[in-house]
Amino acid sequence: MAVSSARTLKGPRRFVRRVAHRANSPQWQFLRGFLKNPVMVGSVIPSSKVLIDKMLGPVRWDEVKLFVEYGPGVGTFTRPVLDRLPPDAKLIAIDTNPDFIEYLEKDIGDDRLIAVTGSAADVRKIIESHGFDHADYVLSGLPFSTLPPGVGAAIGEATANVIR
């Protein structure tokens, strides 16, 4: 009977291990962030590779010193930006969700990444606190259509004031 009980538990243990492993995946972190605050995440799934390549295609990477990303989430764009970013450049990723920032800091081991918990509306203060006076590029993953009234306009104005 003990052998039978051990076999019975083997299935659930395997399931628990599988779920625990997936709990740290980017997809799970993204979904959890969406379920926690759908207004601020704005999507159930991260962007596709095709979209990423189209968005990053026009960037003149050899001229970039500072790239800013709003709403990096689990790093769907962060990783490809870092793949293309020159060795002497920086990426400042700003997100209001501290869980996403913590995930990026743990998951991406790149000294060029500066992950900040904060609002994109404070981009001027954030980049200046890291020694920059302007950004060469700003990429936004923010769900502007679901942001509270006035926040989108404030972010737009702040962005216009820091972009080169």
What residues fall within each predicted segment?
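Conserved SAM-binding loop of SAM-dependent methyltransferases across substrates and taxa
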Residues: 74-86
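Conserved SAM-binding motif I beta-strand of class I
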Residues: 90-95
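S-adenosyl-L-methionine
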Residues: 101-132
